[in-house]
Curated annotation (Swiss-Prot):
PANTHER family assigned to the protein according to its UniProt record, in alphabetical order: PROTEASE HTPX (PTHR43221), PROTEASE HTPX HOMOLOG (PTHR43221:SF2)
UniProt similarity note: Belongs to the peptidase M48B family.
Binding site for Zn(2+): 132, 136, 208
Superkingdom per UniProt: Bacteria
Listed cofactors: Zn(2+)
Cofactor binding note from Swiss-Prot or TrEMBL: Binds 1 zinc ion per subunit.
HAMAP family in the cross-refs: Pept_M48_protease_HtpX (MF_00188)
Xref: PROSITE patterns: ZINC_PROTEASE
InterPro entries (UniProt xref): HtpX_protease, Pept_M48_protease_HtpX, Peptidase_M48
Membrane topology, from the record: Multi-pass membrane protein
EC number: 3.4.24.-
The protein's name: Protease HtpX homolog
Length: 289
């Protein structure tokens, strides 16, 4: 229920923000009508298509057992162990090392890994990463994360459109009730990206700790995930995954780490904190497994 409530709250926040932006930028009743229409379309899109959007953003390609036997069989084996339907299996092209899961429920889920992660992680560490992503699916985190990413992406996109329009004759008609509000335009361009970041931060960082713990329980090997996280953080510094920042929270690890502002506004806890939590969990595992 907590995830469902948070998802609904995010959708409501998006609706209110889009309507407010339309009102201040376009003006009057026209702005309200356009805002309501945009809110309705975006809500439906984020609810039903957010997984497809996430996969498209990262250019993830579906793979079969014959195309990626090692990965496919690993996802299949862990899904059976977790007693969930097997999600779709995807590979993201490129040598950056990362992974994510998406989908509104276990029946409509997907797990995606990069080519880079397949190249650098040994068997036990890759298994721990897959188990982490499956735990997100089990906990229904994937719905909340995907919707939040779509919401934040929509806000950022709208801010960019408003910014571009300033270079091409302005926005808002002269025949509406308010004629467009210059202050509203400025606030949209400046504050909308910040609002997108706040929405990302609304997704609790404890979700990552929970997924880490779920991986440890599923594999019985918390130290493998700890090693994988350290390896992935080092790899991300060398080859970051370039994509819309709104979809950063879907990844198992921040694609760009070690920067003050990046850590301050990160939707992930620090890798050091996650590793320490896993090492503590290792001592407790026989009693909680």
């Amino acid at each position: 229920m907590g995830n469902q409530f948070k998802t609904l709250a995010l959708l409501a926040a998006l609706s209110g923000l889009l309507i407010a932006i339309s009102y201040w930028v376009i003006g009057g009743s026209s702005g309200l009508i356009i805002g309501i229409g945009l809110a309705a379309v975006t809500n439906l899109l984020s609810w039903y298509q957010s997984d497809k959007i996430a996969l498209a953003v990262y250019r993830a390609q579906p793979v079969s057992e014959s195309q990626a036997p090692r990965l496919y069989r690993m996802v299949q084996r862990l899904s059976q162990r977790a007693n969930i339907p097997m999600p779709g299996v995807y590979i993201v092209p490129g040598q950056t090392a990362n992974a994510f899961a998406t989908g509104r429920d276990p029946e409509h889920a997907a797990v995606a890994v990069t080519e880079g992660i397949l190249n650098i992680l040994p068997e036990d560490e890759l298994e721990a990463v897959i188990a982490h992503e499956l735990t997100h699916i089990i906990n229904r985190d994937t719905l909340t994360q995907a919707v939040a990413a779509t919401v934040a992406g929509a806000i950022s996109f709208l801010a960019q459109m408003v910014s571009y329009s300033l270079w091409f004759g302005g926005i808002g008609g002269r025949d509406n009730e308010r004629g467009g509000n210059p202050l509203g335009v400025l606030l949209t361009v400046v504050l909308a990206p910040i609002a997108a970041t706040i929405i990302q931060l609304a997704i609790s960082r404890t979700r990552e700790f929970s997924a880490d713990a779920g991986s440890a329980r599923l594999t019985g090997n918390p130290r493998a995930l700890a090693r994988a996280l350290q390896r992935l953080e080092a790899a991300a510094r060398q080859i970051p995954l370039n994509a819309n920042p709104a979809f950063e929270p879907l990844l198992i690890i921040n694609s760009i780490s070690g920067q003050f502002l990046g850590n301050l506004f990160s939707s992930h806890p620090s890798t050091e904190a996650r590793v320490q939590a896993l090492l503590k969990l290792e001592k407790q595992l026989p009693t909680i497994a």
